[in-house]
UniProtKB/Swiss-Prot annotation:
<dbReference type="GO" id="GO:0005737">
    <property type="term" value="C:cytoplasm"/>
</dbReference>
<keyword id="KW-0547">Nucleotide-binding</keyword>
<feature type="domain" description="DPCK">
    <location>
        <begin position="3"/>
        <end position="191"/>
    </location>
</feature>
<protein>
    <recommendedName>
        <fullName>Dephospho-CoA kinase</fullName>
        <ecNumber>2.7.1.24</ecNumber>
    </recommendedName>
</protein>
<keyword id="KW-0173">Coenzyme A biosynthesis</keyword>
<dbReference type="InterPro" id="IPR027417">
    <property type="entry name" value="P-loop_NTPase"/>
</dbReference>
<dbReference type="Pfam" id="PF01121">
    <property type="entry name" value="CoaE"/>
</dbReference>
<dbReference type="InterPro" id="IPR001977">
    <property type="entry name" value="Depp_CoAkinase"/>
</dbReference>
<keyword id="KW-0808">Transferase</keyword>
<comment type="similarity">
    <text>Belongs to the CoaE family.</text>
</comment>
<feature type="binding site">
    <location>
        <begin position="11"/>
        <end position="16"/>
    </location>
    <ligand>
        <name>ATP</name>
    </ligand>
</feature>
<keyword id="KW-0963">Cytoplasm</keyword>
<dbReference type="GO" id="GO:0015937">
    <property type="term" value="P:coenzyme A biosynthetic process"/>
</dbReference>
<comment type="pathway">
    <text>Cofactor biosynthesis; coenzyme A biosynthesis; CoA from (R)-pantothenate: step 5/5.</text>
</comment>
<dbReference type="GO" id="GO:0005524">
    <property type="term" value="F:ATP binding"/>
</dbReference>
<dbReference type="GO" id="GO:0004140">
    <property type="term" value="F:dephospho-CoA kinase activity"/>
</dbReference>
<keyword id="KW-0067">ATP-binding</keyword>
Length: 191
């Protein structure tokens, strides 16, 4: 099995492409969904409240505001949550060894040094204008958090340069499907 990491900037189309691949029958893992599942655990919530005493109670929106405005709090949370995420990722890979390809969406793949867990990395990208258009349609959109995420993440250009493959998601569906089909063919040649 080839483990493929999918990354990209905020609102670049990562989840859309991951869902597309899932609908086509490929095994997929989403770091954001995994973390949301982890956050449902009461014991884990209590541990996070101990790590981040600034939080009066467990609330994902409050956590987002805190970690995007406090570098130390963000680092503490990442140091706690990343090992749990890695365990889930490794389990996903073990459970899917019989498949040719398995795709994992990891938004901060390079920033978190997760590239070591993948055979290949694909960066999803599009223009800043399209990313902003997509972002403002999200219920949880906050311009301050959006700007802070941009500061924290590597630039799209850096992610494209580091990646083995890249896909421009700022195109029509037909062109996007062509890019995904080409990616799959390129990857299947390497299995």
């Amino acid at each position: 099995m080839l483990a493929i990491g999918i990354t990209g900037s905020y609102a670049s189309g990562k989840t859309f492409i991951l869902n597309y691949l899932s609908a086509k029958g490929y095994k997929t893992f989403c770091a954001d969904r995994c973390i949301k599942e982890l956050y449902k655990d009461i014991v884990l919530q209590t541990q996070i409240l101990k790590i981040l005493p600034e939080l009066e109670y467990f609330n994902i929106r409050k956590i987002s505001n805190l970690i995007y405005n406090n570098d130390i709090a963000r680092e503490k949370l990442q140091n706690f949550i990343y090992p749990l995420l890695i365990d889930k990722l490794i389990l996903f890979k073990k459970e899917n060894t019989n498949y040719k390809l398995a795709f994992s969406e990891i938004p901060l793949l390079y920033e978190a040094k997760f590239e070591q867990y993948f055979d290949f990395v694909v960066t999803i990208y599009c223009s800043e204008e399209i990313r902003m258009q997509r972002a403002i349609t999200r219920a949880e959109f906050d311009i301050n958090i959006y700007n802070k995420i941009k500061e924290i993440q590597l630039s799209q250009e850096s992610k494209i340069a580091k990646a083995d493959f890249s896909i421009n998601s700022g195109v029509d569906m037909l062109d996007l499907e062509k890019q995904i089909t080409k990616l799959i063919k390129d990857l299947e040649c390497r299995v």
